Amino acid sequence: MFSSSQFEPNSGFSGGGFMSSQPSQAYESSSSTAKNRDFQGLVPVTVKQITECFQSSGEKSGLVINGISLTNVSLVGLVCDKDESKVTEVRFTLDDGTGRIDCKRWVSETFDAREMESVRDGTYVRLSGHLKTFQGKTQLLVFSVRPIMDFNEVTFHYIECIHFYSQNSESQRQQVGDVTQSVNTTFQGGSNTNQATLLNPVVSSQNNDGNGRKNLDDMILDYLKQPACTARQQGIHIDEIAQQLKIPKNKLEGVVQSLEGDGLIYSTIDEYHFKHVEL
């Protein structure tokens, strides 16, 4: 999963991520997730921040750095151990000087394959992707990667990390914590109603095609794309999907596994909660 960086300990990147992720914390229940902010944009981070975040949260919770729930992140670093043995994916390791993280890039389209041609071992790249934790391993599901032509971009990325960390310091997180918690508490009582209301279009759309039913893949994706589902940071439990879409769980599990393998959905806090990939 993670390993020590190939850079020397006394290099310019030593110290690991510039800022320690002491405020990083896990959310272990839906009540505590309300205290964390979900940042929808790309969060500039270092591998060490991700490593410390994963070590503190373990497998019981999501990944949170300084009160920010990590969804999409951006990193810069050196490409190592590129593996193109599979037709549909390319795997490689990113070393940013603070640590290493495994990465995977799907190459289902011509554009994806062309993008990865310029990414070779020893190349500095900037990449963006989703953090995914499954069975004790964390990897980055990459949706964008490009070589760095100007090394100033590496320096700028670390300045971004420092700036973002400073903006979301402990004092600022406490100031907005009460407001965020009160807003979530206000709408908590109506969550079930909203979920039921938004479910109707999905269920009724089963009869939109010529055969009278949509295929299971589309039904599951449509359900996970609903605002009520995307707003839930912990993802949707597979039992809920089975119940709401009236699909036998044993049949649903195979479809979900296929969608995850195709990179259309990803697991969140454990192997039973899922969210769709926002492209």
Swiss-Prot record:
Q: Which Pfam families match?
A: RPA_C (PF08784), tRNA_anti-codon (PF01336)
Identify the InterPro entries for this entry: NA-bd_OB-fold, NA-bd_OB_tRNA, RFA2-like, Rfa2/RPA32, RPA_C, WH-like_DNA-bd_sf, WH_DNA-bd_sf
Which cell locations does it reside in? Answer: Nucleus
Q: What does the record note as the disruption phenotype of the gene behind this chain?
A: Affected cell division in meristems but normal final cell sizes. Earlier flowering and smaller plant size. Enhanced sensitivity to methyl methanesulfonate (MMS), a genotoxic agent that damages DNA bases. Enhanced expression of some transposons. When associated with ROS1 disruption, restored silencing of some genes associated with increased histone H3 acetylation and histone H3 'Lys-4' methylation (H3K4me2), but decreased histone H3 'Lys-9' methylation (H3K9me2) in their promoter.
- Any one GO BP annotation for this protein: DNA replication
GO terms of molecular function: DNA binding
Q: What is this protein for, i.e. what is its function?
A: Component of the replication protein A complex (RPA) required for DNA recombination, repair and replication. The activity of RPA is mediated by single-stranded DNA binding and protein interactions. Required fo cell division in meristems. Involved in the maintenance of transcriptional epigenetic gene silencing (TGS) at specific loci (including some transposons) by regulating histone H3 acetylation, 'Lys-4' and 'Lys-9' methylation.
In which organism is this protein found?
Arabidopsis thaliana (Mouse-ear cress)
The source's domain of life comes to Eukaryota
Q: Where is the composition biased (Low complexity)?
A: 19-32
Q: Which UniProt keywords apply?
A: DNA damage, DNA recombination, DNA repair, DNA replication, DNA-binding, Nucleus, Phosphoprotein
Q: In which tissues is it expressed?
A: Strongly expressed in shoot and root meristems. Present in seedlings, roots, leaves, siliques and flowers.
Q: Which gene encodes it?
A: RPA2A
Q: Indicate what this protein is called per its UniProt record.
A: Replication protein A 32 kDa subunit A
Q: Which CDD domains match?
A: RPA2_DBD_D
Question: Which family would the database say this protein is a member of?
Answer: Belongs to the replication factor A protein 2 family.
Region annotated Disordered, chain positions? 1-33
Supply the SUPFAM superfamilies for this chain.
Nucleic acid-binding proteins, Winged helix' DNA-binding domain
Subunit note? Heterotrimer of RPA1, RPA2 and RPA3 (canonical replication protein A complex). Interacts with ROS1. Binds to ASE1/At3g02920, PDX2, At5g62350, RPA1A/At2g06510, ARF1/At1g10630, At4g18590 and At3g52630.
The GO cellular component terms are:
nucleus
